[in-house]
């Protein structure tokens, strides 16, 4: 018997290998080197790996422009414009999250490289999901991402809430993973393959003899993804986990996890199951309505800002799903733009929440934000801009992101769905504006000024720049994601 070694295109794998390599290097150094790896060194390695990934992306984009999209490792990994954009967004998100975590770790007196080892490994899982062209590889990336996050959520062992959140996330996450892999097995039974390209080819050229298997498998896959993006009714873990996790980890969950999950969801529903559009659209229709309305409505009664942002994130996921529902190239580009611009804005928002939370990460009542913009105009003003961008206020990037997903939905015949989403945005405006006005309320005489470390200040500044600059001038990112969509899967 001849052993067939699959062709490996290492340029396609470089980002994933870099993150895995950096994580392993930090782990080995922590275990084998006598002098303890400092938090400065660990942050430096994380940022360096992310910058290397961004550099690789230029070479990957150039290769795709000249040779077209390609697959590698037995067609299980894809290199296309879509994956390049996803990799860059994840790499930038890792840099911003690492900088916030760096200052948080110093404040909480957390030494060593453990946090960054886990963050790098989890990010490698997200990259794997972005580039996956096979259901098994998506599951592998999902598990690598999830396992790292389970530990990160419970990283603050001094707080019982952190351990409780980790246990909840682990139990429900394991349940969702089991549902996903069972769905993959059913799709394999119906089509004879787990490769997304092969599934698409089979469904385009054959009559499905077992449609029940295919529909059941697709539904289970969708449930698995719905859990990861916190779509209603699979969102119940989100508020408790957001509240209990260390705040920098919450920022990772609101950004990097969404990028990986939505990238994989788009590949499965648009690339593999695109011919079954009329089958999965009604399910997604219901999910979007529930996600938009419940996310915005329940956020109204929240006094804890981390729980409020959890429900805000649920509402944002509903808008992102609109582009998926459209099932068109325009919808894919709109979702990609939304995710790419939402990530730095939400990380910057959680950076402010990390600062206001103070030592012990406990001060998360909205009352602690009263008069913040009066005491510290720069910090309060920055948070106001970030909140208005998530609201979708005109002249912010959030406005353009919401506009293009709604336009894609209406073009695909989803006027009623777009109307419900708009109504949910109107509801969400209440809690976003209430929080913003609270920042400028009469100052609390007992409140103290918030210390703003340099690296966290940079992260907040980047979020504000993205919110304003690309709100006024969205063209560069919009053009980039449109080109990436044209190069979506060979």
Which residues make up each language-model segment?
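Alpha-helical transmembrane segments of multi-pass membrane proteins predominantly involved
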Residues: 1-490
């Amino acid at each position: 018997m001849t052993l067939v070694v699959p062709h490996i295109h290492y340029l396609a794998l470089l980002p994933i290998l870099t993150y895995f390599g950096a994580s392993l290097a930090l782990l080995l150094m922590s275990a084998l080197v006598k002098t303890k790896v400092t938090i400065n060194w660990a942050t430096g390695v994380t940022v360096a790996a992310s910058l290397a990934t961004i550099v690789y992306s230029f070479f990957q984009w150039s290769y795709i422009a000249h040779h077209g999209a390609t697959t590698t490792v037995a067609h299980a990994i894809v290199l296309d414009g879509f994956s390049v954009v996803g990799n860059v967004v994840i790499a930038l998100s890792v840099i911003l999250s690492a900088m916030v975590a760096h200052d948080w770790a110093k404040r909480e007196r957390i030494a060593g490289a453990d946090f960054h080892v886990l963050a790098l490994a989890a990010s490698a899982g997200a990259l794997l999901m972005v580039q996956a062209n096979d259901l098994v590889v998506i599951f592998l990336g999902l598990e690598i991402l999830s396992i790292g996050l389970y530990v990160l959520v419970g990283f603050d062992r001094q707080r019982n809430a952190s351990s409780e959140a980790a246990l909840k996330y682990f139990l429900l996450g394991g349940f969702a993973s089991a549902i996903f892999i069972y769905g993959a097995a059913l799709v394999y039974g119906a089509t004879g393959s787990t490769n997304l390209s092969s599934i698409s080819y089979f469904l385009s050229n054959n009559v499905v003899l077992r449609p029940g298997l295919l529909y059941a498998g697709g539904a289970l896959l969708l449930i698995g993804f719905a859990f990861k993006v916190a779509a209603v009714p699979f969102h119940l873990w989100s508020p408790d986990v957001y509240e209990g996790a260390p705040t920098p980890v919450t920022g990772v969950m609101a950004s990097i996890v969404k990028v990986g999950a939505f990238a994989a969801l788009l590949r499965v529903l648009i690339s593999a199951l695109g011919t079954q559009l009329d089958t999965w659209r009604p399910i997604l229709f219901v999910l979007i309505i529930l996600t938009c309305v419940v996310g915005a409505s329940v956020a109204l009664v929240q006094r804890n800002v981390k729980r409020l942002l959890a429900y805000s994130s649920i509402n944002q996921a509903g808008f992102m799903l609109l582009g998926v529902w459209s099932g068109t190239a325009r919808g894919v580009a709109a979702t990609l733009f939304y995710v790419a611009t939402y990530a730095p804005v939400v990380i910057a928002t959680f950076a402010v929440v990390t600062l206001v939370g103070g030592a012990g990460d406990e001060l998360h009542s909205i009352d602690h934000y009263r008069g913040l913009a009066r005491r510290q105009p720069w910090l309060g003003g920055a948070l106001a801009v970030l909140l208005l961008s998530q609201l979708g206020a005109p002249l912010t990037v959030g406005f353009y992101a919401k506009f293009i997903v709604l336009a894609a939905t209406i073009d695909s015949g989803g006027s009623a769905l777009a109307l419900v989403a708009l109504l949910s945005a109107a509801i969400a405006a209440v809690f976003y504006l209430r929080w913003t006005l609270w920042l400028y309320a009469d100052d609390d005489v007992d409140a103290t000024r918030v210390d703003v470390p340099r690296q966290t200040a940079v992260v907040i500044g980047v979020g504000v720049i993205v919110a304003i600059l690309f709100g006024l001038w969205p063209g560069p990112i919009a053009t980039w994601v449109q080109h990436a969509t044209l190069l979506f899967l060979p």
